[in-house]
Amino acid sequence: NYSDNSSMREYISYQIMGEMGLDVPECAYSHITVNGEEWGLYLAVEPVDEVFLAAHFADVTGDLYKPEGKGGTGADLVYNGDDISAYTGLNLKTNLNRSDGKEILALMQALEDGEGLEEVLDVEKALKYIAANVALANFDSYLGNTTHNFYLYEENGRFTIIPWDMNLAFGGFGGGEVDIYEPTKQSMGGFGGGDKRKDTQDNNAVTNAAENTEAQADANNQPQPPDNADMQGMPSMDSGEKPLVTTLLENETYRSMYEGYLKEIVEKYFTQEYMTELVTKIHDLIAPYVQNDPTAFCTYEEFEQACSTDPTDQYSLVYYAVNMAESIENQLNGGEPTFNTSSMQGGGFGGGGKDGPDFGGEKPDMASRTEQTADAQQNAQQNDRPAPPDQNGGQQGGQMDENERSGQQGGQMDENERTGQADGRQ
């Protein structure tokens, strides 16, 4: 994924959310070649379409929305009257010529009034969605300034929220302390805060990205600064009115349910044991492909550090889980946030993926990559993991089975691999 040295933030996020009972897309790691050209490792993500809806809902004839907060209104689900045409950011995806929007208007009205919510909303899944995104510090979502990367599906007048695009989870969107009771007012350290561990700091990636046009950013499938960002792309601390969060958490019963879901995450998923086992399993699967990826966003050494199972390594997913669990538990017991996610920020707009924007800096040549591999092999041995193959050593011991492959024949990607999601790049 873009701006993810571990190449597994999105995969793990979907796995946790799926185990919690949310409707999440299927995903699988894929090694892609196109007409004989190596494109490297991707995460193929199932599109939210008719096939997805049929797998998760009994009725597939309802309205599907993909709200987008940038340049439109309504994505925040704030009620502003009954003129559906005024909600330009809702983005209806189905029933384009048949829907009058009365169901989504009823949802927004209920969120404003705080009454009859369970008639128009799957409250349980909405609370799980909020809890998971809070724990994952995934603020490139409904919770953050961008107010996007989610779907709403209506079945018989009742909406279910569907997660989408989790590559900036684990604090990748902006560092700061996460207040579980006011998550939309989280203190953020900036949009894509620059990689402290790379020489590419000097390439002024964020500055150049701010000068990039919106059209170029869209074309390159890169995240864009929120509408209220300053010239450096620094968002304000308050993501605005978010009734899906505030209305639910103001209700004592729903607030208690939300706390229960956070406790579930702390006790079941954000343990050192669970995260170590999951990270190690994924690492051992994808490491040879990451090491030989011609379009990698980071060095192999940085990948190894992000996958470290040392709970004191501040750049690792295990470190994040252990410390976020402690912070959540402290707040559930009446205390304050204790964890700042700044160390988990990705590399901002930079990264240099396939056909991505050129923000300066050079991709490591084969000699430097070989030197990095030698260092990474030593680190892998210290972590009791299989060392990666050398540049000429093939990919023995790390082969993917058919479920993990891309399903391509003759080097061609199928539609799911192309569409999945725009920034599904590993």
Residue ranges and their predicted role:
Residues 187-195, 227-282:
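A conserved long alpha-helix in the C-terminal portion of kinase-like catalytic domains
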Residues 9, 42-44, 53-58, 139, ...:
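Short, solvent-exposed loop/turn and secondary-structure capping segments
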Residues 173-240, 339-426:
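Disordered, low-complexity segments in secreted/periplasmic proteins that are enriched in proline
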Residues 287-352:
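Histidine-centered catalytic/metal-binding microenvironments
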Residues 24-31, 117-123, 141-142, 269-277:
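Surface-exposed patches in mature extracellular/periplasmic domains of secreted proteins
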Residues 1-2, 18-25, 37-136, 181-219, ...:
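Internal "kinase-insert"/substrate-recognition segments embedded within catalytic cores
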Residues 118-172, 321:
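Active-site acidic catalytic loop and adjacent metal/ATP-binding pocket
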Residues 3-11, 94-102, 121-126, 248-256, ...:
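Soluble non-cytosolic domains of exported or imported proteins
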